[in-house]
Amino acid sequence: EPTVHIRFHNGDEVLGNLIGLDTQNVHFSTWFNEQLSAPRGVLQSLAFLSPGFRILYEGPTSMNGWQLGRDPKAWKYRDGVLISEGVGVLGRNFDLQGSSRIEFDLQWNGTFSLIVPVYTSSLDRFDYRSNSYMFYISRGYVSLQRVQSGAGVRNLGQGQIPKMQTKNRVNVELRINKEKAEMEMYIDRELVKKWRDANGFAATGSGISFF
């Protein structure tokens, strides 16, 4: 299992194991090469991963394992990318249990709206009866809602994303601390918003969906 997360100034990143660090180079191993070295000058950050860290999913490589909603033509897979061509739900059970980091690249044309329920059990439909947290992402802002069966919906706050008004592709990263009931959103490695659910972590599912 990897123990460090290494980021480089050119945007590349790798998970691996640290072998050594001297005044000029960082030495590490990865699953695809026994040992690699890189000059320290190209290194942006090196972070040690928490104990028990594991990679649940890397992809996509196909539609296998993904659940589609009522309109199976709303989503399709092509060349390593999931493409939305209509209004529909796409979900997958990732076996989320503890804290997590969810990362994906998002590209769009024109105006768009994307809802990302996390820690949800509703994978093929949009369901307000499923205990989850829902990120509402559009050009320029993001909002987070807590959805809890029997308690309704509560808006936890909104963050501004001005760079999404001038771009059509960004890297999205969601960091979720289940124990502290805290959630963070990063766009292109920059913190957009941090939320905390004062009532504790309410979501009970283990999947993620896109709508």
For each feature predicted by the language model, list its residue ranges.
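Flexible glycan-contacting loops in extracellular carbohydrate-active proteins
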Residues: K193-F211
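Glycine-centered tight beta-turn/hairpin loop motif at sheet-sheet or coil-to-beta transitions
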Residues: H9-G11, W31-N33, Y128, E190
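SH3/SH3-like beta-barrel fold
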Residues: I6-F8, N25-W31, A38
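Carbohydrate-binding surfaces in secreted/extracellular proteins
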Residues: I102-F104, M164-A198
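Beta-strand-rich interaction surfaces with strong enrichment in secreted/lumenal proteins
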Residues: G88-F94, G157-M164, F211
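Secretory/extracellular carbohydrate-interaction modules
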Residues: I83-G152
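Short, aromatic/His-centered strand-loop micro-motif at the edge of beta-sheets
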Residues: Q148-N171
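Extracellular carbohydrate-recognition regions
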Residues: F8-G11, Q35-V81, E85, R92-R101, ...
